[in-house]
Each structure stands twice: as C-alpha cells, then as structure tokens.
Swiss-Prot record:
Positions with biased composition (Acidic residues): 434-461
Expression (tissue specificity): Retinal rods. Localizes to the inner segment of rod photoreceptors.
Modified residues (Phosphoserine): 337
Location in or out of the cell: Cell membrane
Phylogenetic classification of the source organism: Eukaryota, Metazoa, Chordata, Craniata, Vertebrata
Post-translational modification: The uncleaved signal sequence is required for efficient membrane targeting and proper membrane integration and topology.
Extracellular side: 32-128, 195-200, 254-259, 493-499, 557-574, 626-632
Cross-referenced InterPro entries: K/Na/Ca-exchanger, NaCa_Exmemb, NCX_ion-bd_dom_sf
Role noted for this protein: Calcium, potassium:sodium antiporter that transports 1 Ca(2+) and 1 K(+) in exchange for 4 Na(+). Critical component of the visual transduction cascade, controlling the calcium concentration of outer segments during light and darkness. Light causes a rapid lowering of cytosolic free calcium in the outer segment of both retinal rod and cone photoreceptors and the light-induced lowering of calcium is caused by extrusion via this protein which plays a key role in the process of light adaptation.
Protein's GO biological process: calcium ion import across plasma membrane; calcium ion transmembrane transport; intracellular calcium ion homeostasis; long-term synaptic depression; long-term synaptic potentiation; visual perception
Main location: membrane
MF (Gene Ontology): calcium channel activity; calcium, potassium:sodium antiporter activity; symporter activity
Organism (species): Gallus gallus (Chicken)
Protein name: Sodium/potassium/calcium exchanger 1
C-alpha cells in the first residue's frame, strides 16, 4: 500500500518543482529591466548635458566678443566676469533641480545601488502603511532560514562528516559552524555581488556582537543555576577571535580589501581548524606545563602553612591546599570544541520547538545529553584509546579526592560533560547537596521516556496534523515554508533518503540563498522607506534575525548546565563569520574582476569593528570579575553593553557623531 502512495508523493514533488521553475522564469521575465525606464533615464541624463553644453558656449562667445571689441568704447567688460561665478554654480544647481524634479520621492541622503526588482508599492505607498507587509515578510524569512538550516542543511552536513570520517572537533569547527552561519555567509555574498553595499559586513559585525553580548547575557539570565565557566575553551577561541579582529581592523584601514588580505583571513580560519584537530594534545601540553608550575607554588605554600600553623590547623589548612590543587585539573578537563552546539543532535529545531514544544526555554533533560554524547564517545573510542592515558593517570593522582572517572578518550564529549556536573567548580569539592541533586535528576530522567526524546532529534520532518488548537495555528503559519521544503528536498534523517545527501546539501544552499535574497531585498525596502541605510539594517535587525536560532539553542543548552558549550559556540560561530563569511565573497569578487580590490568604505563600520573588539575585551573583564560564573549580574552587564554598542553604531553610521579612530 505504501508503494503507490510514495510514487504519488514523488510525482507531486516533481510537478511542484517544475511549477516553481516555471514561476521563477515568468517572474524573471516580468521584472526584468524594461526599455521604458532606460529611456526615461536616458532623457534625464541628456537634459543636463544640453544645459552644460550651451552655457559654456555662450560664455566663450561673450568672452571672444569682449576681446575683439574696442576697450575704449565698452567699459562694461569688467561687469561681465562677475556673473561667471554664479553661472558655473548654476550648472550644478540646475542638475540638482533636474534630479530632484525627476525623483521627487527619493531622499537625497539615501542612494540605492542594489540590483533589486521593482516593488509593487511606491515609496509613498509604503510610507502610508504598506511597509508593514515588508516587515512581516522579513520576519517570516527569518523563520524560513532557521527551518531550512536546522531541518535540512545541518543534517546533510552531519551525513557528509560521517562519510568523510571527520572527527567531531574538526567537523564542528567547519561543517557545523557553516550550517549555523549560512544565513550570514549568503547575506555577505548578496551584499557584494547584488546589492553592492556593506549589508553583509554590517550583518556579520552585528551578529558577532549579538552572539557575544546578547546570547551570553540571555544564557546567564535564563539559566536555572549559576553556571561555572572554564578558562581553556574560552581562552582558545577568544585568542583566535582577537587575532582575527586585529587582522580585520588592519585590512579596513585603507577602506579596500585586496585579494591577498582575503586569503590571509581564510588562512587564519585554516589555522583554527588545525588547532581544533590537535586540540587534545595542545590541551594536555598546556595542562602539564601549568600543573608543574602550580605544583611548585602549592608545595611552597604548603610548607609555609605548616610552619605557621599548628597540627590541628594544618589539617584544616590542607583542604584548601588540596582544593587549590584540584582547581587547574578540573578546570582543564573540559576543554572542547565550540561546535558541539551546532550538532544536529544537540540543536532543537525551530519547527520542533514551535510545533511540539511551545515553551522553548523549558528545561531539557540531562539524561538526553549524556546519551547523545555517549554515542559520540563510542565512535571516537577506538581511535583514541592510546592517547592521553598518561596525563590522565597523573590527573587521577592529583585529583585523588575527586570521584570522577576519566575515560581514556580525554577529548570525548561524555567525559567532559560528566566532569562538568560531578567535578568541583572553582577549586571547591563537590557538595553532598549537588550530588544528591544530580542523582535525583538522573533518577527522574531515567523514569521518563528518554528513547522517544532521543528519536525526536533525528526524526524526519513530519506534516502530520497536530491535536491542539495552538499547534494547529502554528502549523498553518509554518505550512507555506515547510511544504515547499518537504516537496523539493530529501530529508536525510529518513533512512531511505540518506543516500541523497548531496541533493539535500545543494538544495538547502539554493533555498538559503533565495531566502537570504528576500531578506536583504525587503530589508532594503524597509530601510528606504524609513530613511536608514542597509548597513544599519544589517547591524541591528538582520543581525538579530539571523542569530535567533543560535540564541534559542544556546539558552536551551545553558539551562541544561552546559555554560561552556553556550559561550564557546557563540565565539566559534563569530570566528567562522569573520574568517569565512567575509573573505569568501571578497575573494570571489576579486577573482571575477581581475583581482581588483573591494571597496568597504562606510561611515561607521570601521568604528563598529573597533567597538566589537572593545566589547570583546569588556566581556573577558566582566567574566573575570564575576569569577568565571554566569550569574545575573553578568547577564545584565552583557545586555547593557549590547545596547550601548547599538546606540553608538547607529549614531556613527548616521554621522551624528564622528568616528575618533578613522583614518
């Protein structure tokens, strides 16, 4: 019975695909640049040419006549040169008057250089209220981008990593990061090749600040408990991020980007991927060096304490010494890549959140995370059994009071996350209350249906009719997005469609490009109506819209207790945006235009990048002042810094204030 139904579904998909292709062709023919606007622009450009060609001719004849005439008869020759100054100025004024008369609706401040189709509504009609449709369409495209990335693009990348047998760290830093940052990448491509503006730069810079400040602040505010951060993942990612930002600032000094500068940024990303490949050995080397120095310092301090205190006090004083001794080892046991958050198994898709879970901030189960990460460990256990056994034996000797058992795969995710829940935080041994809470939560999770929740993450996209009224309303709201995607792209989470992962990969790219084009186009129309530039739209609205899926996923992960994963993923996605999302369009533009440089001049973008660097420093200082804890104070501080950045960036772009660091 299922065979004819499947054939009908295949036929429907083929018919739908042909219908979409035909509609796109008709749309292209209808909205192609016609001859009438070309003639109008030609006549408009001919009029000022005629004026300028006649007036200099009159000036020349008057001057030649004055020279041939007798100076004794006409002394008014000295009066004629006086009107020559306003005559030359009148040429510019007549041109401006002709331009203003030909374009009465456009503002002189905002000039459009993009290649967009003609809108159904004029500027005056949009200012009368029809711009609401563009705003709604832009918000709707945000949801569409999130669905196509989470439901199709990221699972296809997961299949590619399985086929290529790439490790989890490298896959997370490359493919999964590309899946999370695909909208920013295509926005940058559209900004360089279609809109001819800096909307892509503004979107990436704004998205970077949004990920660092707003996402971290939201995770700190909505986390169930105070999250303790470790310094190794944050130090590793922020070090690369600072170097990349400094390179970008240096390249922006001359307001152009050469092809070799784009290659340097791509090389920086390749260095980051290489570091993630050897993350385990690098972490162990840093761990050994720090443990040697800390052991020497702690031995000296222990001897000093024994000399000054009595035997009873010395017994009490050994506990903080041992606690200090545990601090570097436990802090260094959890360094992982930033891209585990972009894993298709860890990401809760927008469609699942809106249909199956109406409260996206609801608590997720700790047991689910352990099961998912244990599956990753099983794949990596065979290849990593011989690595890291000696350093971890030393760790067990140093952390003798710790009850955590470390598996030989030191870089595997389950050992990292189990230590996160069981190991002491900030050098303090785990309390009995924490252990009781963990055991109680595990027992509660064991009683639930964990298998069904694990299957939901890998469950293919379903078009079944929901039961409740609210879910049915959301289903109807998302149906115009979900049905075309379901009809044209195979879902690789379905075992029968897993072999078509290449079609899913390229089909997702086409849909992401189409949705990104609609987003940039409608953002341009909204900005033209309101009177703001595309750079400001990218810094504010587009940056927040493209980062909302990562925001929701980061908050869910933070509420699970994975503060390191939430913070490190935010920084890791920014590294991909700056070192891939920006230089790839620039390099392609240089290649297609004879290796000519790309102009990136803007009123406030350079200063916005400098502000991004300063905000990153403020984040590091704030986390250090909060003693590496994600508490409410840190969340409020991050929100305040984000709104300060937005206000200063908009004022710089509108030239309300001048950039003090511009050259």
């Amino acid at each position: 019975m299922h065979l004819p139904r499947r054939r009908r579904l295949q036929r429907n998909r083929i018919f739908f695909f042909l219908a979409v292709v035909s509609l796109l062709s008709v749309y292209q023919l209808q909205f192609s640049p016609s001859a009438i606007p070309a003639l109008l622009t030609a006549h408009q450009h001919e009029d000022p040419v005629k004026v300028t060609s006649r007036e200099p001719f009159r000036n020349k004849t008057s001057k030649t006549g004055n020279v041939t005439a007798a100076p004794k008869i006409r002394h008014c020759v000295y009066i004629d040169p006086e009107p020559t100054v306003p005559i030359t100025a009148s040429e510019d004024t007549t041109q401006r008057e002709n331009v203003n008369e030909s374009y009465p609706d456009e503002k002189p401040v905002y000039e459009s250089k993009g290649e967009y189709p003609q809108d159904l509504f004029s500027v005056e009609e949009r200012r009368q209220g029809w711009v609401v449709l563009h705003i709604f369409g832009m918000m709707y495209v945000f949801v569409a981008l999130a669905i196509v990335c989470d439901e199709y693009f990221v699972p296809a990348l997961g299949v590619i990593t399985e086929k290529l047998q790439i490790s989890e760290d490298v896959a997370g830093a490359t493919f999964m990061a590309a899946g999370g940052s695909a909208p920013e990448l295509f926005t940058s491509l559209i900004g360089v090749f279609i809109s001819h503006s800096n909307v892509g730069i503004g979107t990436i810079v704004g998205s970077a600040v949004f990920n660092i400040l707003f996402v971290i602040g939201t995770c700190a505010l909505f986390s169930r408990e105070i999250l303790h951060l470790t310094w190794w993942p944050l130090f590793r990612d922020i070090s690369f991020y600072i170097v990349d930002l400094l390179m970008l600032i240096l390249f922006f000094l001359d307001s152009v980007i050469d092809w070799w500068e784009s290659l340097l940024l791509l090389t920086a990303y390749a260095t980051y991927v290489f570091t993630m490949k050897h993350n385990v050995s690098l972490e162990q080397w840093v761990k050994e060096e720090l443990s040697k120095k800390l052991n020497a310092v702690q031995a000296a301090s222990a001897e000093h304490m024994r000399k000054k205190s009595s035997v009873a006090v010395a017994e009490d004083g050994t506990k903080p010494a041992d606690g200090k001794k545990l601090q570097p080892t436990t802090a260094l046991q959890r360094g992982t890549s930033s891209a585990s958050l972009h894993n298709s198994q860890m990401r809760s898709t927008i469609f699942q959140l809106m249909i199956h879970t109406l409260d996206p901030l609801a608590g997720a189960k700790f047991k689910d995370r352990v099961d998912i990460l244990s599956n990753i460990a099983k794949v990596k256990a065979d290849s990593l059994t011989g690595q890291g056994t000696k350093p971890e034996a030393e760790e067990e000797k140093q952390a003798s009071q710790n009850t955590v058992q470390v598996t030989p795969a030191s870089d595997s995710e389950p050992s990292k996350d189990k230590q996160k829940e069981d190991t002491p935080q900030d050098g303090q041994p785990p309390s009995d209350s924490d252990n009781s809470e963990d055991s109680s939560s595990d027992s509660e999770d064991d009683s639930d249906d964990d298998s069904t929740d694990d299957e939901e993450n890998d469950e293919p996209l379903s078009l079944e009719w929901p039961e409740t009224r609210k879910k049915q309303a959301i289903y109807l709201f998302l149906f115009p997005i979900v049905f075309p995607l379901w009809s044209t792209i195979p879902d690789v989470r379905n075992p029968d469609s897993k072999k078509f992962f290449v079609i899913t990969f390229f089909g997702s790219i086409i849909w992401i490009a189409a949705f990104s084009y609609l987003m940039v186009w409608w953002a341009h129309q909204v900005g033209e109506t309101i009177g703001i530039s595309e750079e400001i739209m990218g810094l504010t609205i587009l940056a927040a819209g493209t980062s909302i899926p990562d925001l929701i996923t980061s908050v869910i992960v933070a509420r699970k207790g994975l503060g390191d994963m939430a913070v490190s993923s935010s920084v890791g996605s920014n590294i991909f945006d700056i070192t891939v999302g920006l230089p790839v369009p620039w390099f392609l533009y240089s290649v297609f235009n004879g290796f000519s440089p790309v102009a990136v001049s803007s009123n406030g973008l350079f200063c916005a990048i400098v502000l991004l660097f300063l905000m990153l420093l403020f984040v590091i200082i704030s986390i250090a002042l909060c003693k590496w804890k994600m508490n409410k104070i840190l969340g409020v501080t991050m929100f305040a810094l984000y709104f300060v950045f937005l206000i200063i960036s908009v004022m710089l772009e509108d030239r309300i204030i001048s950039c003090p660091v511009s050259v």
